[in-house]
C-alpha cells in the first residue's frame, strides 16, 4: 500500500499539470473582407501594448498588406515603435523587410518553402491571414496553441538565413 501511495505522489504533479493545461480557455475568431489587415494589426498592438512582448511572423510578404492598406501598415510601425514592441519576421529569399527602424529582425527562407499566407504569434494568440477575394483572418486564442506555434517558429528561425 505504501508503494502505491508513493507512486501516486510521484505522478500527481504531472497529472495536475495536464489538468491545468486542459482548462486553458480556447476561442477561434474569423473575419472576412477588406478590414482583416486593420483587425489583425490592431489586435497585435492591443494585446502587447501594456505588457510588451514580441510578434513572431512567418510567411510575410510585406508588400501585400502594404499595397492594400498603406496607412494602416504605417500606423502599425509607429505603434511598434511607440509601445516598444519587437518583431521577428521570416520572409522569402529575394525580399526585403519593410521596417528598418529597429523594431523588426528579418530572416529568409528559400522561395520553395514559402507560403503566402502569413501567421503571426503574439501573447497567447495565433493569427493566420488567407489572401483572396475576400481576404480571411483567423485568430486562435489559446496559450497552448500559441506555445506550439512558437516552438515551430523557433525551429524555422534557426534554419533561416540572415542574408
Question: For each predicted feature, which ranges?
Answer:
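Surface-exposed cleft-lining segments at the edges of enzyme active sites
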Residues: 26-30, 62-63
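Short, charged amphipathic alpha-helical surface segments
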Residues: 1-27
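Intrinsically disordered, low-complexity polar regions and short flexible loop motifs
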Residues: 33
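Signature of lipid phosphatidyltransferase scaffolds
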Residues: 136-163
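Short, well-ordered alpha-helical segments in soluble proteins
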Residues: 16-19, 48, 80, 157
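Residue-level signal for secondary-structure boundary elements
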Residues: 9, 20-23, 52-53, 88, ...
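Hydrophobic protein-protein interaction segments
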Residues: 36-141, 145
